[in-house]
Amino acid sequence: HSDDFYSQPDWDVFQVRYTSADGYRLFAWLSVPHGDGPFPAIVRMPDYGSVHDLVYTSLRERAVVMNPTYRGQRQSDQVFQAKYPGLLTEGIEDLGSYVMRRVFADALRSMDALTGQEQAELGPVAFMGAGLGGALALAVAARREDIHAVAANTPMALGNPASLQPGLAYPLAELDDYLRLYPARRDVVKRNTADLDPITLAGKITAPVLLSVGINDTGSCPLKFGEELAEKIPDCDLRVYHGASEGGGHEHAQIQISWLSDKLGLG
């Protein structure tokens, strides 16, 4: 239904609810520009945190913008409330109970929810995200050829051996914390996270990708991992910054808007 509080003179905001794996109900914000479509669409995947709210973008006046959530986040937490820290290892000892696998399934369902909505006719679709959101955006693009562009900032290395190194910052450090408590489960952790590795999925991505990394990032996308990921993505524009998990910060945000505008035909 429409949300009068967040709607603006140039766009309307809707609250969207849809069903994911295991019948889990999810929430998303959807904004639709005024005027006649079709409109290009941008899906901003959620990072690792409890709240994923509407975020300002100058493209909202010209594109449909979707802000989905995954299970455990605010407004998608009626059944399960995610813990931060803690979500990365919730149920990790068993393939069937590992919550992060369902988080990735939730990401895939966001594309279905977008294409199934009736508020606007859609043109080309881009996915974007930072941290976990960057990894989710890449994962969806690897499985959906109808995505036209991906802008991923410091995508989380979950599933890659780089995520299990000691001495990392959070949130990846949650994995090392877990293995210090349960050292005998290292092989189980490797096995149950392996197919979430962005590098494993990278070769399947057909869309162009704008990838940003920070040379001091040890909590989400370590530099060596990011560089290897860029090599595996068939069409990747890698930008390296002297930052950490924020990547290029405001500077890269401006580049990203210009890049997305070009890929979506917004001029």
Q: What are these language model-derived features?
A:
Residues 1-36:
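N-terminal cap/lid segment of alpha/beta-hydrolase-fold proteins
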Residues 23-26, 32-41, 51, 60, ...:
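Proline/glycine-enriched tight loop/beta-turn segments at coil->beta junctions
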Residues 53, 57-105:
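Cap/lid segment of the alpha/beta-hydrolase catalytic domain
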Residues 86-131:
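Gly/Ser-rich "nucleophile elbow"/oxyanion-hole loop immediately N-terminal to the catalytic nucleophile
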Residues 139-184, 248:
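Hydrolase active-site cap/lid region
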Residues 224-267:
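C-terminal catalytic histidine-bearing segment of alpha/beta-hydrolase fold enzymes
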